[in-house]
A protein has these predicted regions:
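Intramolecular chaperone/auto-protease modules of tailspike-like proteins
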Residues: 1-119
Length: 119
């Protein structure tokens, strides 16, 4: 929520430009669609800069949990396997919308620098 009544420790003066410069945008394709190139981030790299925007843990895999209906010979804590016997990744993701405040603050900082240089 954006309601001020739900927030505390509000700070307006922080160096967004320095933080933004730590992000490493990349061009890549997904293994499932080798013919399509996209621009984005690698989640584990972005997590070091904007952890609030990243979900999951690098290299995590799906595991069987207590309460799951366990197949024969499987225990809670064992890795889940696909039909080919490969571990099933628990992939990371990035909520791109959570990058918007950082981008806006960086634009404002750069605009202030331009204005100062033009003065």
């Amino acid at each position: 929520s954006s309601d001020y009544r739900l927030k505390e420790n509000v700070v307006y003066d922080w160096d967004a430009t320095a933080r933004l410069k730590q992000l490493k945008p990349a061009r890549f394709n997904f293994i499932t669609d080798a013919n399509k190139t996209v621009d984005g981030f690698l989640a584990h790299e972005a997590q070091a800069v904007v952890p609030e925007a990243v979900t999951g843990t690098k290299d995590a895999v799906e595991v069987w949990k207590d309460g799951d209906e366990l197949p024969d010979g499987v225990s809670a804590g064992d890795n889940k396997l696909d039909a080919d016997g490969n571990t099933m990744p628990n992939v990371q993701g990035i909520d791109q919308a959570k990058l918007v405040p950082l981008l806006v603050k960086t634009i404002l900082e750069l605009e202030a620098r331009i204005t100062a240089l033009e003065a």
